[in-house]
Amino acid sequence: MKDMRICFIGDSFVNGTGDEKMLGWAGRLCAEARQHGHDTTYYNLGIRRNTSTDILQRWSEVSLRQQPDCDNRIVLSCGVNDTTMENGAMRVDFETSLQNMRDLFARMQSSPGLVVGPPPVDDELQNQRIQTLSNAMQSEAKKAGLPFISLFDHLIQDSNYLAEIAQNDGAHPRSTGYDKIARLISDSGKWWF
């Protein structure tokens, strides 16, 4: 069996910001895979405040970690920062964000990939923008033949998750929230293990 190398690229939610265990959902998923005997190496390429534009510009970070003799995988998750308002406008307008997603999805075709949609935050208006973007991402991922997991649809209905982010910084969960995200991904039937 080849060594599996998984690049998780995205924003602060990929990074695990707010998690007291410093694992985030990516670390939890790979720790569980390792416990079940899967030889995995994971690279957390999550950066706080990164938008889809930022991620597209640094895509070479993924390529640097992929090796021809390995089973290379890619997990992309972003979107919340695109929908954040700054100076009266979204950080990345909707059409640019969608085009960035198409470009990112095209780059993911080199390896088995998975797209994890953005989670809700403690801001009703931003959640409307996140939901719109998440739905569009799901549609584009389907066109690209990539599995998509909607965190928003599940977590917006979870009062405990929403309370946790409200008590933290209004966006990021703590360990319990990252446990939930990891479980949603693991139980989706789209995660590889």
Give the residues covered by each predicted segment.
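Serine-esterase "nucleophile elbow" of acetyl-processing enzymes
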Residues: 1-48, 53, 60-70
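Alpha-helical cap/lid subdomain in secreted, periplasmic
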Residues: 31, 38, 57-193
